[in-house]
Amino acid sequence: PVYGGIVLSMERFKRIIEIDERNFQAVVEPGVITQVFQEECEKRGLYYPPDPASRGSSHLGGNLAECSGGPRAVKYGVTKDYVLGLEAVLPTGEVINTGGRVLKNVSGYNLTQLIIGSEGTLAVITKIIFRLVPLPRVKKVLLVAFNALEDAVAAVASIFQRGITPSA
């Protein structure tokens, strides 16, 4: 850490408290490994799209602190797009709950989104409520070689113009 700073490990906060298949939501602690969470969701036909390159070792709380994304962000968005609410501890020691288990929450300031991406400077996240989506029924991998960068750019533009949004 920077001189005078501290390192706070949340790795023991690693419970997946609930995966609610009916409402497409999950409640987790910040020390859950991203890939472990994704696999548990997929066992239930649900999908948590954010896929940072470090998903095999990154913790969900760290993903929120940085608002991580990954290649699938093109289609699905980044971490902040899947957070419905938080439990967090402020520097004063006060425990707060932000957001909630509803898809549209418009009461007051959006403290959830303020904390996401703040890299731990505003609060320590202790619980996360995620929105999930249905697991895609079909996944196809396509690898295409181009002779020139301009051809690749034109192909990508053509794909988007046809209304197709690739996941990466």
Specify the residue positions occupied by each region the protein language model found.
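FAD-binding subdomain of flavoenzyme oxidoreductases
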Residues: 15-167
